Regions:
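An amphipathic, aromatic/His-enriched active-site/gating alpha helix that lines ligand/cofactor pockets
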Residues: 24-36, 55-90
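Short, surface-exposed ligand-recognition loops at beta-strand->loop->(often short) alpha-helix junctions
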Residues: 9-19
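Residue-level signal for secondary-structure boundary sites
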Residues: 16, 60-62, 97-99
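Ampipathic, surface-exposed secondary-structure segments
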Residues: 19-49
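Glycine-rich beta-strand-turn "strand-cap" elements at beta-sheet edges
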Residues: 2, 39-51, 76-104
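Short, well-ordered beta-strand segments in beta-rich or mixed alpha/beta enzyme
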Residues: 2-9, 39-67
Length: 104
């Protein structure tokens, strides 16, 4: 499993449109065999900052599977207008989780 974090800087006047776009895009994520979980969050201290967190089965599943699929085209159709608002987009490996602690 790999976690993708996408940090957006969205003008206040476009925040509702951004969240609506991700609601539409979520249908494509739900349909993907590679997407395990996702969430869209807005910073409470600075509402122009949003983070999208997507758990993928693997980096390859995301980059070679999802991005080559019809689901990606539907996903990008919805969120494409916000691509220039991306401040950072990276993949991370989980090194510690509360789920790990509960199994100990």
């Amino acid at each position: 499993m790999v976690v993708e974090y996408i940090r957006y800087d969205i003008d206040a006047g476009r925040a509702e449109a951004f969240e609506q776009a991700y609601r539409r895009a979520s249908e494509a994520l739900d349909a993907s065999e590679h997407c395990e979980r996702y969430e869209v969050t807005r910073c409470s201290e600075d509402p122009t900052q949003h983070i999208v967190r997507i758990e993928w089965d693997s980096e390859e599943g995301h980059l070679s599977g999802f991005r080559q699929s019809p689901e990606f085209r539907r996903f990008f159709e919805a969120v494409g207008p916000f691509v220039h608002d991306i401040a950072e987009m990276r993949h991370y490996q989980v090194t510690l989780s509360s789920e790990d602690q509960s199994r100990a």
